[in-house]
């Protein structure tokens, strides 16, 4: 009987190792690291303004009072479509607000609230931080320092 013909040994398949998995995100948004920066406060004739960002740099986020109109404007640096959304997350409240560019060609997105809106109180007293999510921009995780409360209270 003839010996069976050996089958050819298959060529080893070269595979590229998969990319490393992304760094795990915190299980809960409130545990995410704080966005680098500090709050500062500035008083003016129309009320107060709290600004968050790197020292000596452009503000990433602002809470601006218009006392005469009884309104607070939330301003996020960055460009967005003509209409977008800004979601504010606190320990007790999550709310999505309609947002628009702050002006023609503006590098800021804004959302406006009545100065008495309970969302503002939730931002001022949340545990650890509050989050600002704006469509198309990175999420900001901001501490509720005293400047936040000062800007809000300057409108009441």
Residue ranges and their predicted role:
Residues 1, 64-66, 154-156:
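Sequence contexts marking disulfide-bonded cysteines in secreted/extracellular proteins
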């Amino acid at each position: 009987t003839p010996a069976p013909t050996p089958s050819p040994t298959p060529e080893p398949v070269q595979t590229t190792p998969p990319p490393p998995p992304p760094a795990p995100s915190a299980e809960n948004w409130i545990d995410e690291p704080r966005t680098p920066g500090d709050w500062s406060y500035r008083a003016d004739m129309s009320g107060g303004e709290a600004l968050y960002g790197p020292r000596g740099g452009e503000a990433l986020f602002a809470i601006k009072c218009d006392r005469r109109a009884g309104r607070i404007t939330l301003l996020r640096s960055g460009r967005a479509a003509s209409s977008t959304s800004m979601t504010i997350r606190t320990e007790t409240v999550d709310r999505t607000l309609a947002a628009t560019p702050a002006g023609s060609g503006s590098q800021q997105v804004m959302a406006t609230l009545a100065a008495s809106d309970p969302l503002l109180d939730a931002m001022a007293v949340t545990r650890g931080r509050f989050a600002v999510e704006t469509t198309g921009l990175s999420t900001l995780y901001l501490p509720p320092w005293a400047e936040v409360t000062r800007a809000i209270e300057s409108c009441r």
